[in-house]
Amino acid sequence: MKKYIILHLSLILLVFIACTDDQKQDDKNITFQRSDFKVRKSLSGKTIEFDSLILRPSQIQLFDSFLVTCNQGAEKQFHIFNLNTAHKEGECIPVGQGPKEMMTPCFVNRNDSVVIFDMMTSTIFTYSIPEFTSGKEPEYASRISLDTKPLWSNIRSLGNGFLGVSYQETSPGFLFDQTGKKTMDFGTYPKTEQEYTPAELINAFRADLTTNRKEKVAITHYFTDLI
């Protein structure tokens, strides 16, 4: 039996200055299977041997010519490597709840600056790339505290604001403006004939998401073939 994946693309127009009931969301459902992918491409690369151990990062991100790894549980969680020189430039961001510390950080999808979401404190930090990759403890350019807590998962940039996984029964996601204020619930859980309690619904359709940073969102539900 062929397995199908339902791609749920949500096209949205965001107005963060005045969030009203006029905000609309257009849904388009597409069903595809593996044989629909007609073009195959091979990827090739080269091995870079750095002068320091990479350890076991849970996340990696490229910023210009720098590879930044996130090692949750290490004394300093972000390690910076120069791809051109294969040299480790330094480490930064210690574990903690101080103003320059983080507990459970994750990268936000930006390439013009370094944006990091601390899940434990529901706080978004923004740094300039030169500042973050300097090899010293960076000074953040902005620090945004989300007004709806906690968000125990992914945050993605969308328009002038952010979209995060809610872990609430009302909707799988929350939209926030650039100040961290929640503007609306986003999306709906898949319909099913089985009845769930709120906790069962959240666990049955645990979500993760990604965006193109502009107007398109893809939400995937763990333990299903739904996107």
Regions inferred by a protein language model and the residue ranges of each:
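Asp-box/WD-like beta-propeller blade repeats and closely related beta-sheet repeat scaffolds
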Residues: M120-T123, Y127-G161, S166
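Blade-loop segments of beta-propeller domains
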Residues: H87-T121, A141-L146
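Short loop/turn segments that connect beta-strands within beta-propeller blades
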Residues: L83-T85, I129-F132, D177-K181
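Structural signature of eukaryotic scaffold interfaces centered on beta-propeller domains
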Residues: R56-F63, P105-R110, W152-L158, L201-K214
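C-terminal motif of bacterial Sec signal peptides marking the signal peptidase cleavage site
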Residues: V15-A18
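Beta-strand-rich domains and repeat architectures in extracellular enzymes and scaffolds
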Residues: G45-Q77
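A short helix->beta-strand "capping" segment at the edge of beta-propeller domains
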Residues: K28-L55
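Beta-propeller fold detector
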Residues: K41-K46, H87-G96, S134-L146, T183-K191
